[in-house]
Each structure stands twice: as structure tokens, then as C-alpha cells.
């Protein structure tokens, strides 16, 4: 099976499959009402291929990038594997028990709030209560991990801005928190694009280090004793968890053992007959007081653009930006933000969501015509809330009504700047030995490389 946006050149001459012929013969149109010609034009080289039951915003798991080994590991990134560990804890000797930790992405909470018709706070408590009724020991919110990711991105952008020149091109800085986009950059775009990727680790990667390193030491546990599960909106996070080096902690342990989508967790909840008591989400610091659900200033993501923009405006130009105005350009998934003074544009940032916009952005970047200092890049149109692990119908299309409801819920969550977290500042000192220490670079940053397409592939269908 191929991804519907497969970019392998040899695929472009392949004939349509029977399924495609059937679609053409019965005259069915795409769900958004666009004509086939228009759809083809919009996708450009991201041509539609055979039997597209898997989407690029789910993963890039066509046979050009997923190896057999990765395929076997992906089969373990499932609810079955999660429940297997829970059942082993119930049957085996206590000395062999594993401590189960579940970390929930903030973009997953609106899904549960919408699905169960609850406020986002009540949905958080219900989810936590359910997971603990299954046998999970701790449930964390990944917002604190996003704090670190954003703060390190802010510092990196300012450094790049100062170092940028015609001889040493450091800009634009492209975000790297979206694993679908990063995998595409490494597997397809390669060396011309890799240097522009932000080296700050994604929230999932940082959370893995927090759980398997900091939290493990606080609890006097070896990292191997912890089974860490992340609940996320999209399938790409599963591939991110498998990436060697990218998601491995200082002690050599894999930061995330299993990734489950919001939809997979909801399915477990629906199939369970457990009596659930609402419980507040845990904190890494053992606080007894319940922490309110908060988010960063992103439209439907972790908010790297907004927070880096404000920080850069202040650090580079002494300008305090309160309200950010997003100006839609090509379409609703491509926005521009500028900082202007006396008619001069000082900073020009952009958000490019969805691979149609990413393709256009990359073409301009390769030609040296991309005017931006910073681009927030996400594989999913409309951002992380539209992850295929929570916002799609059974036939694989976006559930627009659900997505709109989730966007409304998410926008109502209070915004907290990462700089305001006292816990983060404490962790910089206690865990990382200072904000500019070598350990910060080692724990919170990574590197990317151009990866040759794999010849040993495996077709994946989720």
C-alpha cells in the first residue's frame, strides 16, 4: 500500500488501480467538493496513488521509508501491547511489575471533552480516572515538556538570527516538533533542507527524558522498570517513538515505549465496563494541589510560532508584542505574522500546515525566494487537533464537525507562557544544571540527517 501523497518518482507513471477506476466511473467527488482536476492541481507532485486508505498526515509509512524492523516495532505500538503490560502486572510477581506512566498531549483533551460532552477539565479527570482504573500508576500532562521545547526553540532562533549571513545561512528556522514533517524532510528533501530544522526536541521527546530520567530518579526506579505511554492526536508519533537517538534518554533507555492515539484510547474506554471515578492528573513534582488544564498560545498546536515571535521581538528589537495578528495568504492553512516598525519589516514569520503548503514553501526555499525568518511546519491541515488519530471519520476523511468543536474547546483553555512556569525554571537548575549547561544541549536538543530511501520495505495499514 502507498501513502496517497507518495513522492517516489517511479510511482508517477503507474496506472490507476481498480479502486481508482471505480471512483472515476461512478463520478464520486472528493469530500470537500473539489473536482478531480483541481485536487490534482493542488497536490502537485503529491499525486494520489492506489487505494489511499493511509494518509501522509497519519504517517509516511509507504514502503520507501518503513523498514521491516520498524514494521515489527510499529505492531507493538498498539492498544493490545498496552493492555498486555497491564495484564502482566496483574499476574506476575510484584518484583517484576512495571510502573505504567501515561503522558497526555494537550491537543488530545479537546477530543475527549467533545466525545463525552464534558468540560476539558472534567474530561481530563475522567481520562485520568479511567486509566488508573485499568492499572496505570501515573498520568501526566505533556505541557511541561512543550515548555522546554518552546524555550529552547526561542533561544535557538535568536542565536541563528545573529549568526545568519549570506555566507552562513541559518534562516529560515523550520520547526521540528511534527514527526510527519521531519520524516519527510529527512527521507525525501534531504541535505538542502536539514540544516534549517530547529534542533530543539519535540514535546514527546522531552517528555520521554523527563519520565525515564528525572522522574525515574525521583522514584528510585531504573528506566527499564517504567513503561511510558504517550496519548497523542496522530499516528506519526508512533514512528517518532521508534527513532533511534531522537527519542532515547541520556541513560540509553527509549523515552517512549508506546504511543496510542486519542481514538485508540477512546475505543478502549468504550469497550470497558469499569466503574470510573474522576481523578486529577498527576504532576512530576508530587504536588497535592490539582493543576489547572492550560495550553500554549497556538491556534491548534503547541504554539512555537507565537512564543518564538514574542521572544524574538523582545530580545532582538526590544518590542513587546501582546496580540499577534495572523494574516492568511494562499489559504487558511498558510498564515503570516510580521513585526513592523516605522514602515520596516523587522521579523516575518509564517505557519505552513498541510503538505500542499509545505511543498510550496520548500520550492521557494530551494530557489532562495522564501522571505521568512521562521516557519512553523505541521503535516496536518489545520494543525495538531486535526491529527488522523482523533479527527477522522471511518472512511478516512476529516470529521469537520468534530474538528470545529475541538477547536472551540481548545481556544477556551487558558494560555500560559512557558516562561511563567516555576517548575520549569527549577528543573533547569535541579535536573539540567543550568539554562546554558552542556547537559541542556545533550538532553533537550538533537540532530537530523539525510536518510536514503530504504529498499527493504513493508506496507503498513492501520
Swiss-Prot record:
Record keywords, A-Z: Nucleus, Phosphoprotein
Keyword Nucleus attached: yes
GO molecular function: lamin binding
Biased composition (Basic and acidic residues): 1-19
GO cellular-component term (any): nucleolus
Region (Disordered): 1-43
Subcellular location(s) of the protein: Nucleus
The keyword Glycoprotein is annotated on this UniProt entry: no
Modified residues (Phosphoserine): 35
Family, per entry: Belongs to the NARF family.
Assembly and binders: Interacts with LMNA and binds to the farnesylated C-terminal domain.
Designated name of the protein: Nuclear prelamin A recognition factor
Amino acid at each position: 500500500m502507498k501513502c496517497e501523497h507518495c513522492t517516489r518518482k517511479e510511482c508517477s507513471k503507474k496506472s490507476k488501480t481498480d479502486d481508482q477506476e471505480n471512483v472515476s466511473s461512478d463520478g464520486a467527488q472528493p469530500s470537500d467538493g473539489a473536482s478531480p482536476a483541481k485536487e490534482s492541481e493542488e497536490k502537485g507532485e503529491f499525486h494520489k496513488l492506489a487505494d489511499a486508505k493511509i494518509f501522509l498526515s497519519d504517517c509516511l509509512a509507504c514502503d520507501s521509508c518503513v523498514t521491516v524492523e520498524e514494521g515489527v516495532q510499529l505492531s507493538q505500538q498498539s492498544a493490545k501491547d498496552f493492555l498486555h503490560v497491564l495484564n502482566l502486572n496483574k499476574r506476575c510477581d510484584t518484583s517484576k511489575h512495571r510502573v505504567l506512566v501515561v503522558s497526555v498531549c494537550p491537543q488530545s483533551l479537546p477530543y475527549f471533552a467533545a466525545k463525552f460532552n464534558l468540560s476539558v477539565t472534567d474530561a481530563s479527570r475522567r481520562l485520568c480516572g479511567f486509566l488508573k482504573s485499568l492499572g496505570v500508576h501515573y498520568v501526566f500532562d505533556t505541557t511541561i515538556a512543550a515548555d522546554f521545547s518552546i524555550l529552547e526553540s526561542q533561544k535557538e532562533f535568536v542565536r541563528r538570527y545573529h549568526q545568519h549571513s549570506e555566507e552562513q545561512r541559518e534562516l529560515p528556522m523550520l520547526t521540528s516538533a511534527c514527526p510527519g514533517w521531519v520524516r519527510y524532510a529527512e527521507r525525501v528533501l534531504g541535505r538542502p533542507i536539514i540544516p534549517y530544522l530547529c534542533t530543539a526536541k519535540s514535546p514527546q521527546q522531552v517528555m520521554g527524558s523527563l519520565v525515564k530520567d528525572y522522574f525515574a530518579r525521583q522514584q528510585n526506579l531504573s528506566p527499564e522498570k517504567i513503561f511510558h505511554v504517550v496519548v497523542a492526536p496522530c499516528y506519526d508519533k508512533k514512528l517518532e517513538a521508534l527513532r533511534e537517538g531522537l527519542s532515547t534518554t541520556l541513560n540509553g533507555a527509549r523515552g517512549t515505549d508506546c504511543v496510542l492515539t486519542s481514538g485508540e484510547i477512546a475505543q478502549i474506554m468504550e469497550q470497558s465496563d469499569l466503574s470510573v471515578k474522576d481523578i486529577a492528573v498527576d504532576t512530576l513534582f508530587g504536588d497535592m494541589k490539582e493543576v489547572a488544564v492550560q495550553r500554549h498560545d497556538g491556534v491548534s498546536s503547541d504554539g512555537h510560532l507565537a512564543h518564538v515571535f514574542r521572544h524574538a521581538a523582545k530580545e532582538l528589537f526590544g518590542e513587546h508584542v501582546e496580540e499577534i495578528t495572523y494574516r492568511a495568504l494562499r489559504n487558511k492553512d498558510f498564515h503570516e505574522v510580521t513585526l513592523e516598525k516605522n514602515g520596516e519589516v523587522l521579523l516575518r514569520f509564517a505557519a505552513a500546515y498541510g503538505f500542499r503548503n509545505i511543498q510550496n514553501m520548500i520550492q521557494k526555499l530551494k530557489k532562495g525566494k522564501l522571505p521568512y525568518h521562521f516557519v512553523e511546519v505541521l503535516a496536518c491541515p489545520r494543525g495538531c487537533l486535526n491529527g488522523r488519530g482523533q479527527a477522522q471519520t471511518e472512511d478516512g476523511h476529516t470529521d469537520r464537525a468534530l474538528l470545529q468543536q475541538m477547536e472551540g474547546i481548545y481556544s477556551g483553555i487558558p494560555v500560559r507562557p512557558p516562561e511563567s512556569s516555576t517548575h520549569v525554571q527549577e528543573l533547569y537548575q535541579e535536573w539540567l544544571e543550568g539554562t546554558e549547561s552542556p547537559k541542556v544541549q545533550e538532553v533537550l536538543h538533537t540532530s537530523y540527517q539525510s536518510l536514503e530511501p530504504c529498499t527493504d520495505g513493508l506496507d503498513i495499514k492501520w
